[in-house]
Curated annotation (Swiss-Prot):
It holds the Pfam family DHO_dh. Binds 1 FMN per subunit. FMN binds at residues 62-66, 86, 139, 172, 217, 245, 268, 297, 318-319. It comes from Shewanella oneidensis (strain ATCC 700550 / JCM 31522 / CIP 106686 / LMG 19005 / NCIMB 14063 / MR-1). One of its GO terms (molecular function) is dihydroorotate dehydrogenase (quinone) activity. This is Dihydroorotate dehydrogenase (quinone). One of its GO terms (biological process) is 'de novo' pyrimidine nucleobase biosynthetic process. PROSITE patterns: DHODEHASE_1, DHODEHASE_2.
């Protein structure tokens, strides 16, 4: 009931202003008595993923809490993990406003945020300050003004700084809103990046006597051949996990709607089938060697179950969480326990 009232108010506001207000409110209430307005008890449904044990298979996707400001609040809601970021080595403002659009009839969102964040040093401070022991993944990317050819340096800088504070690290090369970023998904650039990241992971594991798993987040706009090539690169470089998928550049299912022609990545219900298809293809290519987090268009427990059936070990929600609220977490966990 509380979420429906809050949502009604928020949906009258500019989407980015509403988002910032929500994150700010959650930051202030996350670990105090006011979190009773959204906290919920969820029956544990432990799942093993990348050598880690999560209390349940439902996580918050990257992009919601870029700077790790409201982690404790999302823990109170019952998420099994939170993925913060995307974070870059240096702070950056992101793309020009407006850059976030609701497509309410389709339960969808278009964004062209452009990795707006306060930088990796600020994120680390927030990770240290969090009060709860929730599993936190850190999604890392490159700064907009870093040439693609030097992009791996940005990922390595972020790895160095977040390594001791992350349950796992997610490598984002699939956002459509940073020029040239998706080119890192192909050919020599992909192999060079994954090789460098794996070498850095092993170096840090030896230095700190702690192994932090690494996952790669991929786009939904890939051919089967491109998916096969990514799978082979993941296996070759001994990555620990994959996250499928990011937002799509397609506009299937939103034609004619207000804001449908805005540039950026489309998320939400129109992405459901495409994301599930990519998960299934990726799982087939990986042959059980590397586990997958399924994300993209999960608007119901049934959508999540389809991701599990396609080969995902865990799932993440974002747009569906905005449209459905925290109850979606509980519904998915209950369905998972019964499957």
């Amino acid at each position: 009931m509380f979420y429906k009232i809050a949502q009604k108010v928020m949906f009258q506001m500019d989407p980015e202003r509403a988002h910032n207000l929500a994150i700010g409110s959650l930051r202030m209430t996350g670990n105090g008595p006011l979190n009773a307005f959204y906290a919920q008890n969820i029956t544990p449904a432990p799942v093993s993923f990348m050598g880690l044990t999560f209390p349940n298979p439902v996580g918050l996707a990257a992009g919601m809490d870029k700077d790790g400001e409201s982690i404790d609040a999302f823990h109170a809601m019952g998420f099994g993990h939170v993925e913060v970021g995307t974070v870059t080595p240096r702070p950056q403002p992101g793309n020009d406003l407006p850059r976030l659009f609701r497509l309410k009839p389709a339960k969808a969102i278009i964004n062209r945020m452009g990795f707006n964040n306060k930088g990796v040093d600020n994120l680390v401070k927030n990770l240290i300050a969090k009060k709860t022991d929730i599993m936190v993944g850190v999604n890392i990317g490159k700064n907009k003004d870093t040439p693609v050819e030097q992009g791996k340096d940005d990922y390595l800088i972020c790895m160095d700084k977040v390594y001791l504070h992350a349950a796992y690290i997610a490598v984002n090369i699939s956002s459509p809103n940073t020029p040239g970023l998706r080119s890192l998904q192909y050919g020599d650039l992909l192999d060079e990046l994954l090789s460098a990241i794996k070498a850095k992971q092993l170096e840090l594991a030896d230095k700190h006597k702690k192994y932090v798993p690494i996952a790669l987040k991929i786009a939904p706009d890939l051919t089967i051949e491109e998916i096969e090539n990514i799978a082979q690169a993941l296996i070759k470089n001994q990555f620990d996990g994959a996250i499928a998928t990011n937002t799509t550049l397609t506009r299937d299912g939103v034609s004619g709607l207000a804001n449908a022609n805005e540039s950026g990545g489309l998320s939400g219900k129109p992405l459901t089938e495409l994301s599930t298809k990519v998960i299934k293809q990726l799982a087939t290519c990986l042959q059980g060697q590397i586990p997958i987090i399924g994300v993209g268009g999960i608007n119901s427990a049934e959508d999540a179950l389809a991701k599990f059936d396609a080969g995902a070990t865990m799932v993440q929600i974002y747009s569906g969480f905005i449209y459905q609220g925290p109850k979606l977490i509980k519904e998915i966990v209950e369905a998972y326990r019964l499957k």
